[in-house]
């Protein structure tokens, strides 16, 4: 029994129903920062700490990452759509106008990203028209969130071919409401009600 051929457009449309975060995978090669936008990123193992991402086999950025043996995963925030678009483009200098600092291994950490994961390339596996790259995590951190700015600290998401974000749950009371209710309804020894 033969398997029916899968139409590439249908394949993309169906997989587009799965919402993903957006990362920028970066490295430095011959002292030049390199990076690309990547949705195919995932945690792989806690012990040892491993992550994975899947670049296309034609990716020039992957060639630089492979040569350097290191990379940094930058998890983008909701307000970084322009950063994602820039790194998803064919611009020759994707870092023009992008503020960044070097990670412990020397790969770019993009300012404003929600988190970064600094890795060494551990293994590379064939994945059809992509490579499946395992990274050994060497350092990681998340952006410090100021309580009043917490609403701005949401991930940038991609769903059905478009950017999207997380809407606050309008059915759950805000934290201040819970705190106020607890304060107003708390009883103590001197409560006279």
Task: Kindly give the residue locations of the regions a language model identified.
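Basic, polyanion-binding surface patches
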Residues: 1-193
């Amino acid at each position: 029994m033969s398997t029916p051929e899968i139409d590439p457009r249908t394949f993309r449309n169906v997989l587009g129903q799965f919402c993903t975060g957006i990362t920028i995978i970066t490295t430095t090669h011959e002292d030049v920062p390199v990076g690309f936008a990547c949705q195919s990123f995932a945690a792989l193992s806690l012990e040892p700490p491993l992550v994975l991402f899947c670049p296309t086999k034609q990716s020039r950025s992957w060639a630089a990452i492979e040569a350097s043996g290191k990379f940094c995963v930058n998890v983008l925030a909701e307000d970084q759509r322009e950063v994602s678009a820039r790194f998803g483009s064919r611009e020759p200098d994707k870092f023009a106008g992008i503020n960044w600092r070097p990670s412990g291994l020397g790969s770019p950490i993009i300012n404003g990203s929600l988190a970064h994961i600094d890795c060494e390339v551990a293994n590379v596996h064939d994945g059809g028209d992509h490579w499946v790259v395992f990274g050994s995590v060497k350092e990681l951190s998340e952006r410090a969130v100021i309580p009043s700015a917490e609403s701005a600290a949401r991930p940038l998401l991609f769903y059905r071919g478009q950017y999207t974000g997380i809407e606050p749950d309008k059915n759950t009371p805000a934290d201040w409401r819970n705190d106020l209710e607890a304060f107003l309804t708390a009883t103590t020894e001197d409560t006279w009600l």
